[in-house]
Design a protein with these regions (language model features):
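Acidic, serine/threonine-rich low-complexity disordered tracts
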Residues: 1-14, 110-218
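Solvent-exposed N-terminal domain segments of exported/luminal and surface proteins
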Residues: 1-70
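Extracellular-facing segments of soluble proteins and assemblies that are Gly/Ser/Thr-biased and enriched
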Residues: 48-131, 135-136
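Residue-level detector of functionally pivotal "anchor" positions at catalytic/ligand-binding pockets or at interdomain
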Residues: 211-232
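Short, solvent-exposed secondary-structure boundary motifs
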Residues: 42-59, 123-126, 172-177, 218-224
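Short coil/turn motif common to extracellular beta-sandwich-like domains
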Residues: 235-240
Length: 240
């Protein structure tokens, strides 16, 4: 039974995190990830991602798709409009972000990955393999600038390997495994972690966010406000 006190954190910015029904994307992506029991890529939630451009490739209207059930919270894939055409990308297998029920000391391991054929545009073939190892390593109360919450803490160790095949050169290579650790404080009735800390190798903090009150005008679609903060000292110890 822990007491985590992060009440003195100071936010540097605020973003809006909105969860939509999967059918609300208004494109062929919603058909690919339709909420149907016969669909292996079934989803019932989605969230907007960031648009970007890479050379001749323009990526817009990015969506992350999720399936929330009594057994798990998983990501079956994501999709975007690439050069004007919808491109769904299924994770095979899907990424199990949480496996329910979550109780103290419970664990689960999820293997996921996807492939992306960009040989006609960028001349590369890209694939990702991800291993997510979850451990519920604490329970108690956590205090942030927004309030005090009963919470479970989930530690997720994520190891990702990216592979590239360069079509014009006729060879491929894989990057060294990249390990990140996510600490998430989950509280009943909250749709997002009330606090999340992401770290890289050596415990270097790469991102922190906590559930916050709105500092801008609210609308009906807004699910929650997320404040991002800078934490010191950096790196942190295992007492995080």
């Amino acid at each position: 039974n822990y007491t985590w006190d992060y009440s003195l954190l100071t936010s540097t910015s605020q973003t809006i995190d909105t969860i939509f029904d999967e059918a609300s994307t208004g494109s062929l992506l919603s058909l690919y990830f339709i909420d149907n029991g016969f669909n292996p890529n079934r989803s019932n939630q989605c969230r907007h991602g960031n648009s970007f451009s890479a050379g001749q490739v323009n990526v817009s209207d990015v969506w992350d798709f999720f399936y929330n059930s009594s057994a798990s919270f998983a990501q079956p894939g994501y999709g975007a409009i690439v050069n004007g055409a919808p491109l769904p990308i299924a994770f095979t297998p899907k990424d199990i972000i949480y496996q329910f029920p979550l109780t103290y000391n419970s664990t689960n391991v999820s293997l996921s990955g996807y492939t992306l054929d960009l040989t006609t545009t960028l001349g590369i073939y890209y694939s990702v393999e991800k291993t997510r190892s979850n451990l519920v390593d604490g329970w108690g109360t956590v205090t942030t600038p927004y309030g005090t919450f009963d919470a479970l803490r989930v530690m997720s160790t994520i190891v990702e390997v990216d592979s590239f095949y360069i079509d014009s050169l006729g060879f491929g290579f894989a990057t060294p495994p990249i390990e990140t650790v996510e600490y998430k404080w989950l509280s009943p009735g909250k749709g997002v972690p009330v606090l999340q800390v992401n770290t890289a190798v050596g415990g270097i903090v790469t991102g922190i966010s906590y559930l916050d009150s709105m500092q801008t005008t609210a609308t009906a679609e807004i699910a929650s406000a997320i404040s991002e903060i800078t934490l010191f000292p950096n790196p942190v110890s295992k007492e995080l």
